[in-house]
Amino acid sequence: MILLHFVYSLWALLLIPLINAEEFTPKVTKTIAQDSFEILSFDDSNTLIRKQDTSVTISFDDGETWEKVEGIEGEITWIYIDPFNRHDRAVATAMNGSYLYITNDQGKSWERITLPDSGESISPRGCYIETHPLNKNYFLAKCNYCEKTEVNNDNEENSGDEEGEFEIFNITRCTDKVFASNDGGKSFSEIKSSLERNENSPISISDCGFAKTSKDSDLESSDTSIICLFQNMQFIMDEFSSPYTESKLVLTTDWGKSLKEFDQFKDKVVNGYRILKSHMVVLTQGDRYNDMSSMDVWVSNDLSSFKMAYMPTQLRHSMQGEIYEDAMGRIILLMSRERSDQEEDKGIVSEILISDSQGLKFSPIPWTANEVFGYINLYQPTYLKGTMIASLYPLSRRRNRKGKAKGVKSKGVTKISVDNGLTWTMLKVVDPDNADSFDCDITDFENCSLQNMFYTREGSTPTAGILMTTGIVGDGSVFDWGDQRTFISRDGGLTWKLAFDFPCLYAVGDYGNVIVAIPYNADEDDDPQSEFYYSLDQGKTWTEYQLETTIYPNEVMNTTPDGSGAKFILNGFTLAHMDGTTNFIYAIDFSTAFNDKTCEENDFEDWNLAEGKCVNGVKYKIRRRKQDAQCLVKKVFEDLQLFETACDKCTEADYECAFEFVRDATGKCVPDYNLIVLSDVCDKTKKKTVPVKPLQLVKGDKCKKPMTVKSVDISCEGVPKKGTNDKEIVVTENKFDFKIQFYQYFDTVTDESLLMINSRGEAYISHDGGQTIKRFDSNGETIIEVVFNPYFNSSAYLFGSKGSIFSTHDRGYSFMTAKLPEARQLGMPLDFNAKAQDTFIYYGGKNCESILSPECHAVAYLTNDGGETFTEMLDNAIHCEFAGSLFKYPSNEDMVMCQVKEKSSQTRSLVSSTDFFQDDKNTVFENIIGYLSTGGYIIVAVPHENNELRAYVTIDGTEFAEAKFPYDEDVGKQEAFTILESEKGSIFLHLATNLVPGRDFGNLLKSNSNGTSFVTLEHAVNRNTFGYVDFEKIQGLEGIILTNIVSNSDKVAENKEDKQLKTKITFNEGSDWNFLKPPKRDSEGKKFSCSSKSLDECSLHLHGYTERKDIRDTYSSGSALGMMFGVGNVGPNLLPYKECSTFFTTDGGETWAEVKKTPHQWEYGDHGGILVLVPENSETDSISYSTDFGKTWKDYKFCADKVLVKDITTVPRDSALRFLLFGEAADIGGSSFRTYTIDFRNIFERQCDFDITGKESADYKYSPLSSKSNCLFGHQTEFLRKTDENCFIGNIPLSEFSRNIKNCSCTRQDFECDYNFYKANDGTCKLVKGLSPANAADVCKKEPDLIEYFESSGYRKIPLSTCEGGLKLDAPSSPHACPGKEKEFKEKYSVSAGPFAFIFISILLIIFFAAWFVYDRGIRRNGGFARFGEIRLGDDGLIENNNTDRVVNNIVKSGFYVFSNIGSLLQHTKTNIAHAISKIRGRFGNRTGPSYSSLIHDQFLDEADDLLAGHDEDANDLSSFMDQGSNFEIEEDDVPTLEEEHTSYTDQPTTTDVPDALPEGNEENIDRPDSTAPSNENQ
């Protein structure tokens, strides 16, 4: 009984304080205001300020009462507390930016500071003040000014300036200006930019800051040191809209009077800088012409010398404001991911890199390195030393089958470290009372833990280990933000318990003993009014306080920033008022809780950070109030005190890996070859190995007794020495236990993103060219197919084995996951709309329990929302095209064409629709073999009788025309053809003439502009059984094509010999072909074995398209103009691949050089500024590279062990300086697959200086493709090319900068044969025997408005040619009337009788009157015709009474003189002719015909039109165009006498009299000795 009484008494004693606590109600004071969203606190005071509308209000009693600040005039845009003088200083900025207000006494008085007037209008960014941490009188005022100019948004096309200028945006010019003051703002001086601003720079940036950024700064600098970054930016009007930036980073110590530039950054573009406590960090942009290029990080501790930090990945989208330093001096970089402008979450953090304590080697958070990409957040409470909480939210969004019913779900994982990131654990939920409310077993921490995302970088209010957060509990496989709840921790985040079932805003006070929380949604407790909850026992129990109004909480905060006070501000708003938002500001006061009792010593306990372990060589503890103590600490304005005790012995936790080492999977520091190359350890020794300690003590660690660290011998074999370019090459190796079976880059300049699929069906993504590779989380599904959108370069689609489709539109940074229609996957590719990114067609199988089931058939499903929803579009469709989006002038933009194969039939039909087959369905062809689209054409293969094919072409989707193939004796049935490509108005097609497997070949054809009329370009062009053809157009250059022909095609067709291939090249789009000229000597300086002058017997031959392992490995690159690699040999024909060498050309194929004796793989970088070769089919540890366009080659060892390189690649535009090698190495127990990223960026001294208008500069000159280049396609062209090998080009569309020097006169090379004509051995176009020219009147049917047509001359001008004048081989005949248009034709070419008769009669009357007047006044009056013979010039006997008489007499005398001379001339001529005839008859006795002394090209061209007269069936046979000179010498005895040289030449010459060649150049160059015609391959 006594015991029970004692228990009851004890219970009562404990209960009474709790009852008192429950009875306690905080003091709540409400203030109603308009448009007030931010409240600021002065440190260690009761004063608060806020901006209300455009004025400033202040409270001196922790927010209970407010008053307007009277000393501030005008409209205020924003206010802020001075971060270095938080106790008493605040700044208010005026709307116009010309002045601001400062208080130095917590708002009691305000001083107006007037800024210098620049004479320019201030921008909305206005001005703001930066203060100094040590001197209150030091100010930097940063202002932005913009000129009052209209923004021109016109997007007119380039006018086509000769030098390829890019248009500069005409936008408002804005300028940053910085003003400095050292007298508290009484006077300012401008720190002027040291960059000269030109008229094309719309933006000028000046960013200055004090070198000291904290009161405990470790940087070696004076108090007056100021760092300034000046930038001028201008924009290039190209497809990337890239800004061009020039910059200077300077230091001033005399307030801008003198500026000292940092030498290390003189030739670099400084993107930004950040001054920290111990470091200055500078970011330099890798490419000044691409603001999305990767950046380098430079670190300095003394503001004089900078070192480049090692980055494990490319830094492209850093958040410069989010570069900071932790307590250990480590630099933390937050990397944002680039997003489109339409996305709301643009700029969110995607990766976090943390340096070592020296700031020179960065690495990602370890457990995120091999995870998928996503949003990453790092929370480091400064008052909890060593604590880091990281959250990863992968960018894979999942939607349900219908897309929206269940909302957006995502995966996430959160981990915590209390030892500076050395070890990480899950956020454990230890809450037995609420265990049943979770969907997983909270005792299984690895699979059931707290996941959160919304921590800020630093905790705002210090507490003794008491933290709150919102999140969910699970295994990370499902994360729905709508299911968030609120949790609390009392041990610094290691363990958590549930506080509320809903998410809340929260704030803590009294070092965590008072907590206030308010739900985001007022309806959480089923009543419409808002409420807040508070706890006085560190979250153990909660009490509700009901508010009378429904508000949307904006912020809840402790009025003392150091967390020592017990007063709070709750700021919320309501939208109930029509005139704007109304704010409700609640002041909440807990200072009298527990009957105003203050805690005593026995109310406190020790709380140890990191569970009492050593952190940074120190054990930390905090004295905090016991949870159930009935008191408040009440040490207002005192900072939370942290007690530390140095640890006696140092452990491995106090060390980090030395620069040359990295941690392996077990946590051991092991040597890294790439880091060894970057360091200087091997520069200090001549030995093969050097001892290096793998561990170094963390900078700032306070442990007392260092650990003994043994050195490790590092191999220096193959490590480049300091001072060599090879020293600057950076290689990153990745090893895998699987093979990469597929890879493809996204074709953008934003970054070097690529997607890879391994042999297990797993997807991997890299955004830095393979340097870092991360796995894509497909939720357990095997990836069975990958499709890239050919029209939108950032989009790709991954097909999962369980019916999911994963789509990305940002190069793999994020994925949207949707379910495919409930149909069997057939493996058919997607078909995309060329103008709508989210519209595509998917093909699935219906009734396909078995793929062989007779009911199984394909169905085309349409999506317009990127795959969220699909609708069934057409049954039995196996291939569709969005035809309306492909044509330049479509008949209907919504037209879709589909190939349909019915279940019961083997035939296929082509149908079209303009409403996705809802109501409109039109059958275009009843029976087809297939169809495809290329270059604005759709070509349909239709079966014909006798197993032949016919092709039909359309350019609008409605009208189809049969493609007319040329008649040729070697073409039998049209059984197979391959569309090669379509560009600039013509289709190239290969028509098979021999289809015996292994012996395939055919003819190369080219169409006219509408794709309907084809002519033969070359015979016996090689193809393989799969239809691939040895045909390649050289990228970036007009009209250059390489093909391989079967030289022994007749015997191959007869099955007597195997194929013998020869390589041919054309420089005028197939009109003329030649064999490749071989180099005179090989790569070793030796002559080649074959030395025949005939190219038919000795030329260069290259392996072509049909033998490639990867069809992307082309000879040429669109960005490296004129350059080509190829594997081949010099000889009579092509040898087997293994017996060949590697050849290279820089002039588009005119001349070649052997660069390697064996087959090599090649790749272009930096627009050809860096060339890389690697041996093919043999193990190697080295690559060869050239920076002088192949003139010299250097070898570089990229790995320690030899590997078999499977492929070498880079970005599709070949503009990067980094290459990716895929290799396979033999290891113990098998082989391992490896990738090597080789970065050449640092071997160049600088970036080339480029004028964005395309003008020549010191580093770029215009030059022809080769010294022998003359006219090509009717014009002479020069290309802008780099001249200095020591600089790199970067992201400049260099291939687009060219200029035409002039248009040339037309020559034979500007023409090709017309339809039904063929090119004879002599170079002329002749009509095919037995055929007539194409019916020219057909054009009248295609164009009903025409009234006339012209007959073909046998030639047609090459579409690419711009020649003017000269030879007119395509000159049309006389016009003929179109059928049915005879009347219009006559009207066009006849003249009306009435007007003509009037004019004719009028002229006759005038002539008659004039003649009569002259006769009457000049002849009859002077004696008539009888005296006509007596008149002499100057005769005075004529009658002249006035001026009229004198004029008439002069006319008569002049006429007499003219007629008398004509008579004399006729008489003299008659005599000479008789004399000449006599001599000619004498010579006919000894000669058989006339001869010419010298017939030069000019004379020939003068007669060209005459030679072409007649239009006979041989197309005005010009005899031949063989390789002969244009001047013809004759024998001495044939030289005529002087008289003979005047022999009249009036007859038209016969074909035997025409010269044998037309020169290759134009008329202006005919006298040059090297002006010769191309050789003919059949001579």
UniProtKB/Swiss-Prot annotation:
Its main location: Golgi. The lineage of its organism: Eukaryota, Fungi, Dikarya, Ascomycota, Saccharomycotina. It comes from the Eukaryota. Residues 1533-1579 are annotated as: Disordered. The chain crosses the membrane at residues 1394-1414. CDD domains: Sialidase_non-viral. It is a single-pass type I membrane protein. Glycans are attached at N96, N170, N447, N793, N1010, N1303. One of its GO terms (cellular component) is Golgi apparatus. PANTHER family: SORTILIN RELATED, SORTILIN-RELATED RECEPTOR. It comes from Saccharomyces cerevisiae (strain YJM789) (Baker's yeast). The gene is PEP1. Functions as a sorting receptor in the Golgi compartment required for the intracellular sorting and delivery of soluble vacuolar proteins, like carboxypeptidase Y (CPY) and proteinase A. Executes multiple rounds of sorting by cycling between the late Golgi and a prevacuolar endosome-like compartment. Binds the Golgi-modified P2 form of CPY, and this interaction is dependent on the presence of an intact CPY vacuolar protein sorting signal. This is Vacuolar protein sorting/targeting protein PEP1.
